[in-house]
Amino acid sequence: MQKDASLSGFLPSFQHFATQAIHVGQEPEQWNSRAVVLPISLATTFKQDFPGQSSGFEYSRSGNPTRNCLEKAVAALDGAKHSLAFASGLAATITITHLLKAGDEIICMDEVYGGTNRYFRRVASEFGLKISFVDCSKTKLLEAAITPQTKLVWIETPTNPTLKLADIGACAQIVHKRGDIILVVDNTFMSAYFQRPLALGADICMCSATKYMNGHSDVVMGLVSVNSDDLNSRLRFLQNSLGAVPSPFDCYLCCRGLKTLQVRMEKHFKNGMAVARFLETNPRVEKVVYPGLPSHPQHELAKRQCSGCPGMVSFYIKGALQHAKAFLKNLKLFTLAESLGGYESLAELPAIMTHASVPEKDRATLGINDTLIRLSVGLEDEQDLLEDLDRALKAAHP
């Protein structure tokens, strides 16, 4: 699919993406039946030829044929050597964190998904890990924050929900001045289609596949991709030891979702841009935040490290909390719900929904106030989306 001329200026799409999404790890020749659709292997245990001699699978937690196919496909799409699937995005986060030991320090982007913030702040810190929250979009702050105890840097780009970007390459240069710090990039918002963190210098690319990678709001899953054989070996040991693996059925569904990732993301980009432009010219809107708009302070960075933008659009409605609630109440096509990245359009109020667990003082500093609304723009007809937003804005501000 060719990008609309008005959406140009970003990196070119990654070569062979759709072909790899459809075929890698799913070759019919690997099945006796020659099935062209990935079979679902529900078996929990597998017959061994001799005691202690398996044919590649022993117990489904340790390895499953359907999960293996998904992991091969994701590795290809992330431009990675290895990929691992987990039961959720947070399960992936927890497993990565187990690479560390008590006394180590994590530097985390100051603005991240609320669940990530909660896990680092209230759970990981209880196990002897030091957590520092830093605005990694400012590389000087990142460099100043690194201590001898720093072992992992966690960045999210774009951030959730204010869509702030971090320069992955610049962060990697700073982090890798020391040979013992792991750089993790949460790629949930961009997906493998629009951004490849490993190619930009990250050590680990992770995402919540619940969102764009699966894209149908019917799977909870996390994905982790790496190029390092050592990191892959350590993470696979933890994947098996901690046991937070997805079901074979969910792996099948995610594989199916990947096959349409390219066409979905192109449509999300088109619709997201249309919504952002509409909101930016609306008198009832205070400010729009979308990396695809020239008005975004890091628009040029987005064009340098991404091949496009997803359907995530955040904006500040004029007025106060009552106006934000009125707007959300009067939406008909957009569904009031958490999560994102599905084919259906969603709207939410981060301050009291997805980011309610973030301390109020931190929310205020980050700009997550009572008038910030986050949209996950879906695949519906563009005009229908714009009319729904226009109607709800007029209802909030008669």
UniProtKB/Swiss-Prot annotation:
Say if the entry is tagged with keyword Lipid metabolism.
yes
Q: Name one Pfam family in it.
A: Cys_Met_Meta_PP
User: Which coarse location class describes where this protein primarily resides?
Assistant: cytoplasm
Instruction: Write the record's keywords in alphabetical order, separated by commas.
Output: Amino-acid biosynthesis, Calmodulin-binding, Cysteine biosynthesis, Cytoplasm, Lipid metabolism, Lyase, Pyridoxal phosphate
Q: Report any one BP term from Gene Ontology.
A: transsulfuration
Gene Ontology terms: cellular component = cytosol
Activity regulation, per record = Activated by calmodulin in the presence of calcium ions.
Quote the EC number. Answer: 4.4.1.1, 4.4.1.2
Could you say which cofactors this protein requires?
pyridoxal 5'-phosphate
Tissues where the protein occurs: Detected in liver and kidney, and at lower levels in small intestine (at protein level). Highly expressed in liver, kidney and lung, detected at lower levels in stomach, small intestine and adipose tissue, and hardly found in heart, bone, and thymus.
Can you tell which superkingdom this protein's organism belongs to?
Eukaryota
Q: Does the keyword Protein transport apply?
A: no
Per its record, what triggers expression of this gene product?
A: Tumor necrosis factor alpha (TNF-alpha) promotes the binding of SP1 to the CSE promoter, inducing its transcription.
* Residues annotated with N6-(pyridoxal phosphate)lysine modification: 211
Tell me the route in metabolism or biology where this protein functions: Amino-acid biosynthesis; L-cysteine biosynthesis; L-cysteine from L-homocysteine and L-serine: step 2/2
Q: Which residues bind substrate?
A: 61, 113, 118, 338
Q: Which GO terms describe its molecular function?
A: calmodulin binding; cystathionine gamma-lyase activity; homocysteine desulfhydrase activity; identical protein binding; L-cysteine desulfhydrase activity; L-cystine L-cysteine-lyase (deaminating); pyridoxal phosphate binding; selenocystathionine gamma-lyase activity
Look at the named UniProt entry and state the broad enzyme category this protein falls under.
lyase
The entry summarizes the disruption phenotype as follows: No visible phenotype at birth. Mice exhibit strongly decreased levels of hydrogen sulfide (H2S) in heart and aorta. Mice also show absence of protein sulfhydration on target proteins. Hydrogen sulfide serum levels are also lower than normal. No effect on brain hydrogen sulfide levels. Age-dependent hypertension beginning at about seven weeks of age. Deteriorated the loss of skeletal muscle mass in aging mice.
Which transformation does this protein catalyse, written as a reaction?
L,L-cystathionine + H2O = 2-oxobutanoate + L-cysteine + NH4(+); L-cysteine + H2O = hydrogen sulfide + pyruvate + NH4(+) + H(+); L-homocysteine + H2O = 2-oxobutanoate + hydrogen sulfide + NH4(+) + H(+); L-homoserine = 2-oxobutanoate + NH4(+)
Task: Show the InterPro entries listed in the entry.
Answer: Cys/Met-Metab_PyrdxlP-dep_enz (IPR000277), Cys_met_metab_PP (IPR054542), PyrdxlP-dep_Trfase (IPR015424), PyrdxlP-dep_Trfase_major (IPR015421), PyrdxlP-dep_Trfase_small (IPR015422)
Cell compartment(s), UniProt: Cytoplasm
Family, as annotated: Belongs to the trans-sulfuration enzymes family.
Assembly and interaction partners: Homotetramer. Interacts with CALM in a calcium-dependent manner.
* Functional description taken from the UniProt entry: Catalyzes the last step in the trans-sulfuration pathway from L-methionine to L-cysteine in a pyridoxal-5'-phosphate (PLP)-dependent manner, which consists on cleaving the L,L-cystathionine molecule into L-cysteine, ammonia and 2-oxobutanoate. Part of the L-cysteine derived from the trans-sulfuration pathway is utilized for biosynthesis of the ubiquitous antioxidant glutathione. Besides its role in the conversion of L-cystathionine into L-cysteine, it utilizes L-cysteine and L-homocysteine as substrates (at much lower rates than L,L-cystathionine) to produce hydrogen sulfide (H2S).
Q: What is this protein called?
A: Cystathionine gamma-lyase
Q: What is the lineage of its organism?
A: Eukaryota, Metazoa, Chordata, Craniata, Vertebrata
